Every structure is written in C-alpha cells, then in structure tokens.
Amino acid sequence: MSNSSQQVPLTDMGNPRDALIIGGCGFIGSHFVDRLLSDPQVVKVTVFDNLSAGHLWHIENHSNDKRLTVKIADVRDLPMLIESATGHTTVIHLASNPDIAAAATNPSIDFDQGTLLTHCVAEAVRISGVKTVLYASGSGVYGDIAELEAEEDFGPLIPVSTYAASKLAGEALLSSYAYMFDLRTVAFRFGNVVGPRQTHGVGFDFIRQLISDSKKLKILGDGKQSKSYVFVDDILNAVLTANAKSLKPFDVFNVATGDYITVSQIALLACEALNIDVNNVKFEYSGGSRGWKGDVPVVRLSSNRIRSLGWLPKRKSAAALLDAMKAMSTEPRTSSK
C-alpha cells in the first residue's frame, strides 16, 4: 500500500491544488468551483458535466479564469473522462441521477446514472494516475431504520431505493479500487443538502410551486417526514476537512446538522421565504408516510466522526432551509429547468 495513505498536496487554505469536479455545473459542484477558484494557490480546476441537471450559468462568473477548463461530456465516455482526469491529483465525484423518485417508473436509471458512472470514474482514476477521490454518497445507504441514529459502522446496510443502492455500490467499488490500486477515497453520506442554485429537493419544489401559485401548495406524503438539512457551504467545509485529515485508503463520514425538521415545517418556511401569509395558502397532502416509493421518511445521522476532525455546521436545519429558499426565490431560473 505504497500510496493509499498519502495525501495530495494542499494549499495553505486546505484545498487540493487541483481537482476534476465531475458534476461541476450542478448544485454542489458549482459551489466547489467557487471555493477552489477563490484560492490563489489552486492551479487547475476541470469541470466535467453533461448538463443533464447542471447549468453553465452556475459557473459563468469564472468564465475568464484561465485555471478553469469545462468539458461538456458524459461520464460514460470513458476515453474523454480519462483524458480529462489526466494531470489531476484529486477527483470530486458528484454525478448521479438527480431525480430519486424517477426509479419507480424507470428502475434502470440509478444503475445507468449511478453505479455505472462510478465504475467509469474508478477506471478513469486508476488509468490516469489520480490519487484521491472525494465521493458524494448518501444517507440512504442505511435504509429505513426509523429513529435510530446511524453511525458510519452501522449495519447491515439495506437500501430501500435504487438510488441508495447505487450509492452503496459506489462506495464498495471505490473501496476496492483504493485497496487494489493504491488510491485514496473518502466517501460522504450527506443529509439533505440545500443552498443557492439548488436544482431539486423539497425546498426547491415548494418555492417553484408558490411562485407559480401562492394560494396552494401540494405536499408529498403526510408532511411528517423528518430529516437533517445541511447548507452547501457546510458540506464543502466537511469534505475539505476530511480530505485534509483522513489518511485511510478508504474512509466514510456522515455529514448532518444534528437536528431535524419536518416537511410541514419546511412548507411554512417556504411561505416565510416568499413573504406569503400561510393563512392564505391551502396545503394539500398526497397522504402516506413516504413522499414516494423508496423515500425514507425519518433519517437520523450521527456526525460525531466528522465533528471529531474539527468540523461544525454553521447553520441548523431551519436556518439552512430558510437561507436556501430565500436565495432560490431570487434566482431567475428557479421556475425553469
């Protein structure tokens, strides 16, 4: 294991000096672009995105930065991915199917846009000589365990959606590549991530609905679904903290705020974000404990491991959601794709 425990060089700000960001035009990816290019010691950032969920406007502020290269291509184009990865030490892998509920009618989507993508990333990393992969997994890998607060070594892991299954398969693939090919992978099981440029999620959906019709809001499920919501800046801080401090060939971290909020409470926050009187809004619930097949209605995550490295969220769930929805409400493209 000659290289697996060796970190790539970091800047004085703790960032990788170069990175290929797969999904870099998306919600989280574009914030990574902002963060890395704000660091003068970062020498190169390459964005790789097929724009299925991302948008070029997310990174347009950096169009004149010569350190940035943008590749519009599909991750399944392995030769292009290998070419783009070559010369980088770090890959930030964020690409996946953005529509979790879509698998109910298209069960193959999470294999094609999840498991297969991560296999392509693993191969590109192996062939190109990249040393570190930072992988966006998800809390769904734990399955439906109700109020039990999951730590990273919880088991057995029994996903209840193909999306979560693809994330777990991705962790397994990257772990095996780390040990077999002297790589280093850090996987992150995020709570629900929110913030400006969000392209999906309950807050995004509520804001779009209320902008279209401020008198009515359709809510999936019974509104009692309860989860942790993490602001995107806190996600970036967690990933970069773990990248700087974790030395294992494969490591995994939950990232959550430690508090929880229900969908019904989010509906009220959406009205607050838009300065709408909730008494004038008709809330229509679809019923049932789950928003869709494969949804996990209650998610509890322990984030003690990432906190032990010095990370703390700057916002709790309600503040993260309110700030995110206020930002989304001012974005001209919120009401369109």
List the predicted regions and their residue ranges:
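The catalytic Tyr-centered alpha-helix of NAD(P)H-dependent dehydrogenases
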Residues: P159-S166, F190, G195, T199-G203, ...
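N-terminal Rossmann-like NAD(P)+-binding domain of SDR-like oxidoreductases, especially those catalyzing
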Residues: M1-G191
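A glycine/serine/threonine-rich, flexible loop-to-helix segment
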Residues: L148, H200-Q209
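C-terminal substrate-binding subdomain of Rossmann-fold SDR/epimerase-dehydratase oxidoreductases
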Residues: N3, T11, A73, I211-K337
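Residues in well-ordered alpha-helical elements
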Residues: P79, A101, S108, H119, ...
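Hydrophobic alpha-helix immediately C-terminal to the catalytic Tyr-X-X-X-Lys motif of short-chain
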Residues: A169, L173, Y177, F206, ...
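Generic structural signal for alpha-helix termini and adjacent loop/cap motifs
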Residues: H31, D39, W57, N106, ...
